[in-house]
């Protein structure tokens, strides 16, 4: 079991624990796909700290393993695995755990590709999927003796509802039901779901962990016994994160806390500006005191921050919203988040496509809804760009 060294930023910088033969304090990028046997007759090779032999790049890689050690410490878990995308990580978890007859409870508002893969898998594997309102109360009520897994996002995408993990820990037997928490929006800076009984934590490392919009990756952190099983599934499915991508994510993680704090601080300032603007109908951000999720966010989050993503409704039609989007200059029209650049997207066109139409209406994902992911620009430039686009 890997233990956290110290506070989060120190772990982010030093948590790889790589001892280099040449004294390099930066873990090298090991591009080799194959590794020599130390004892060919016995079929033995060099072992990693996980207890797995280095034989073939689809199984293990020293650079990728260094990133996994960092993530393990950031999430205060026992082990972690890195995948070649967030969806590869999520898909592997679902394929590993869900069997014919399994029931999974999932909020109707999660990343739409997660919903889509469950829609595809359910009839083929005989899985029962129960979609519920994204609240701890609705989730707990849906869990019964046949429930195998609860999958949720701590902060939902795109309307920023915050699910009270402490409520779930009190009202669900999380030894019998596997809780999988997607911590992409909140990151370990704000929250460590394992503290509340989650057996697994997943991230799209493409977002805040990588942080620069130049690498696609995913991670899963959790109990070592589960990680050992998932390692076999990753080996079979071929989803390991490649070494150069692992290096980029590891480099991004070093500045995670610094970046996330600035993005969160800027996001709150932007949310406050938008909340007072006459062209804005409403703002969805738990950092606003009037948000219905403000109190639960303050209770759960480990810092007085509320994340770098907010959503808001333009006062007007879909055409008015499109005009606003076209006028943006500093803020880029891109369907991602967590990077250095601020990005705006219309969830009905990107990100929420696979959420059922009637659920979109109920959740408030309307044609005039804009999701705004704050980057590292000066917050005054972001506000000025929004002001001119709204004028």
Annotated model-derived regions:
Residues 268-341, 355-361:
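Conserved small-domain helix->loop->beta segment predominantly found in fold-type I
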Residues 51, 215, 305-309, 367-371:
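Short, solvent-exposed beta-strand edge segments and adjacent coil->beta transition regions
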Residues 39-88, 113-120:
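Conserved N-terminal alpha-helix of the aminotransferase class I/II PLP-enzyme fold
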Residues 2-3, 9-21, 79-279, 284, ...:
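Conserved PLP-enzyme active-site core in the AAT-like
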Residues 1-51:
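N-terminal glycine-rich, Lys/His-bearing helix-loop that initiates the first secondary-structure elements
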Residues 119-120, 128-130, 259, 326, ...:
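PLP-dependent enzyme catalytic core of the Aspartate aminotransferase-like
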Residues 2-9, 15-16, 36, 62, ...:
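Positively charged, small/polar-rich N-terminal and surface patches that mediate targeting and assembly
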Residues 249-258, 308-315, 371-375:
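Short, well-ordered beta-strand elements within core beta-sheets of diverse protein domains
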């Amino acid at each position: 079991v890997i233990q956290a060294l110290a506070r989060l930023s120190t772990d982010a910088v030093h948590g790889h624990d790589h001892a280099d033969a040449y004294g390099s304090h930066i873990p090298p990028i090991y591009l080799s796909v194959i590794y020599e046997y130390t004892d060919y007759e016995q079929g033995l090779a060099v072992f990693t700290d996980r207890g797995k032999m280095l034989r073939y790049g689809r199984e293990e890689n020293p650079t990728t393993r260094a990133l996994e050690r960092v993530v393990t410490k950031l999430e205060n878990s026992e082990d972690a695995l890195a995948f070649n995308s967030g969806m590869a990580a999520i898909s592997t978890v679902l394929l590993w755990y869900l069997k014919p007859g399994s029931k999974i409870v999932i909020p109707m508002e999660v990343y739409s590709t997660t919903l889509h893969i469950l829609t595809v898998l359910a009839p083929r594997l005989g899985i029962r999927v129960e979609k519920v309102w994204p609240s701890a109360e609705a989730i707990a009520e849906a869990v019964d003796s046949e429930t195998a897994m609860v999958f949720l996002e701590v902060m939902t995408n795109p309307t920023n509802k915050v699910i009270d993990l402490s409520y779930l820990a009190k009202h669900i037997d999380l030894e019998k039901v596997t809780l999988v928490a997607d911590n992409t929006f909140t990151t370990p800076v704000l929250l460590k779901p394992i503290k509340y009984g989650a057996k697994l934590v997943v991230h799209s490392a493409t977002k805040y962990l990588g942080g620069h919009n130049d690498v696609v990756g995913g991670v899963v952190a959790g109990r070592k016994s589960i990680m050992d099983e998932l390692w076999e599934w990753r080996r079979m499915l071929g989803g390991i994160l490649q070494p150069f991508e692992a290096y980029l994510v590891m480099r991004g993680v070093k500045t995670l806390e610094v970046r996330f704090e600035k993005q969160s601080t800027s996001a709150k300032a932007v949310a406050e500006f938008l909340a007072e603007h006459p062209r804005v109908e409403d703002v969805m951000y738990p950092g606003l005191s009037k948000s219905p999720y403000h109190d639960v966010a303050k209770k759960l989050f480990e810092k007085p921050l509320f994340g770098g993503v907010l959503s808001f409704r333009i006062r007007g039609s879909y055409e008015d919203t499109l005009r606003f989007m076209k006028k943006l200059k500093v803020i880029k029209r891109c369907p991602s988040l967590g990077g250095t650049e601020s990005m705006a997207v219309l969830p009905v066109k990107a990100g929420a496509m696979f959420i059922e139409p009637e659920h979109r209406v109920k959740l408030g994902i309307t044609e005039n809804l804009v999701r705004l992911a704050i980057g590292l620009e000066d917050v005054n430039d972001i506000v000025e760009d929004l002001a001119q686009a709204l004028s």
